[in-house]
Every structure is written in structure tokens, then in C-alpha cells.
């Protein structure tokens, strides 16, 4: 939790959802005793946050379709970017991230939290100690039930119900559409992240 770190100041936040802004302001005030500048009057207001001199880095935790665009804009503004998964949705967007980094020299990091789970780190430690010998084959995938995330009753996130899209709330409002309209593993780094590190 960044709010627990003494070397982190949260100077600004941005969200188009006023309820999320209120929750974030409350947590920041409780942890830091300060109120951050607030942005979110429209979908592109995040660019005004990126223009602030007292912002060194941003954490991007928006619906997926915004991840690449916001990360590219952050790097072009000279701000380090930590972007939630998935950082991109197309091969072209992957190259947008690479090319922007190479052009700007600004770093970004995909916040693939699975890599830091205790069980994954334990296996990585065993790999580094050569417990398994030479690894010649890996298999991975997205391995948990998401029905409670992708559907709800439109009143309570992560619960009962079958609503999604405009009738849903939280992630079911936007995330379920990806499964409906895309034939893809929309979270490939959950599986690939750990084995990529182990194969290195």
C-alpha cells in the first residue's frame, strides 16, 4: 500500500467517478493528513494532472481501454507510470509503449501483482536454487472463477446477480464486455509474468 510508505506523497488524484474520488480522498487524508488536488471533470482531465510539477509518477488503475493511452501520455510528460494489467489490448498498443519509452527515456512498469504472490515467489526461489533442474516446458493461464466479478445485481459489487454493462456496477460495468466481444486471454500477464521470470 503506497499510503503506508513514508517516502510517498499523494499530491493529486484523478477519476471520473465522484464516489471513487471521495473514497480516495478519505483514505489519503487518513494516511497522510493531506488532501490531494482532484481531477476528473472529464475523460481527458488526467492530462492536467500530468502537467503538475509536483507529480513524479502515476499509478494507472482505470478500465483497460485507457491503460495504453494514459501510460503513453504519462511517459511523454516525463512521469514514471505504473499501469495495472493489462497494459495494452493489441499488439500495436504494445509497440506504442515500447516506442514511447525509447523516444522519451521515461520508464513504465506493468503492475502484474501475481509475480509478487508468496506462492509464486516461493517457486521462483526454488527455480533459482535449481531444485527442479533444467526447466524445458511451461504452461500457464488464467485460473480462477470470475463470475462474481463480471456479474452483479447492479447494487453491490462482487456479489449476486447477472447484471453487467450499464446495469452493472464496478468492474462488471466495463470488464464483462471484453469477454463478450473479444476472443482472447485478456489478462495474459497473470500466467506469463511468473513463468517469464522463471525462464529468465
Language-model segments: what does each one mean?
Residues 1-83, 92-107:
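N-terminal glycine-/serine-/threonine-rich beta1-alpha1-beta2 phosphate-ribose binding loop
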Residues 17, 86, 141:
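Anionic group-transfer/hydrolysis microenvironments
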Residues 84-86, 112:
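Short beta->alpha connector loops at strand-helix junctions that form conserved
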Residues 88-92, 118:
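Conserved PLP phosphate-binding loop immediately N-terminal to the Schiff-base lysine helix
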Residues 104-109, 114-200:
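Predominantly a Rossmann-like dinucleotide-binding segment in NAD(P)-dependent oxidoreductases
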Amino acid at each position: 500500500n503506497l499510503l503506508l510508505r513514508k517516502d510517498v506523497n499523494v499530491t493529486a488524484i484523478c477519476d471520473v467517478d465522484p464516489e471513487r474520488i471521495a473514497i480516495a480522498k478519505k483514505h489519503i487524508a487518513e494516511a497522510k493528513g493531506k488532501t490531494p488536488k482532484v481531477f476528473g471533470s472529464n475523460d481527458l482531465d488526467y492530462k492536467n494532472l500530468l502537467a503538475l510539477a509536483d507529480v513524479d509518477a502515476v499509478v494507472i488503475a482505470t478500465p483497460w481501454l485507457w491503460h495504453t493511452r494514459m501510460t503513453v501520455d504519462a511517459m511523454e510528460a516525463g512521469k514514471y507510470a505504473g499501469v495495472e494489467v493489462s497494459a495494452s489490448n493489441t499488439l500495436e498498443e504494445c509497440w506504442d509503449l515500447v516506442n514511447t519509452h525509447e523516444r522519451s527515456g521515461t520508464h513504465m512498469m506493468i503492475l502484474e501483482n501475481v509475480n509478487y504472490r508468496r506462492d509464486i515467489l516461493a517457486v521462483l526461489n526454488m527455480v533459482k536454487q535449481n531444485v527442479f533442474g533444467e526447466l524445458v516446458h511451461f504452461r500457464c493461464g488464467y485460473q480462477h472463477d470470475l463470475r462474481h466479478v463480471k456479474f452483479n445485481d447492479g447494487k453491490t459489487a462482487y456479489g449476486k446477480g447477472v447484471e453487467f454493462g450499464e446495469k452493472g456496477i464496478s468492474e462488471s460495468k466495463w470488464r464483462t464486455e471484453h469477454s463478450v466481444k473479444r476472443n482472447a486471454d485478456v489478462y495474459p500477464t497473470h500466467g506469463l509474468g511468473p513463468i517469464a521470470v522463471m525462464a529468465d
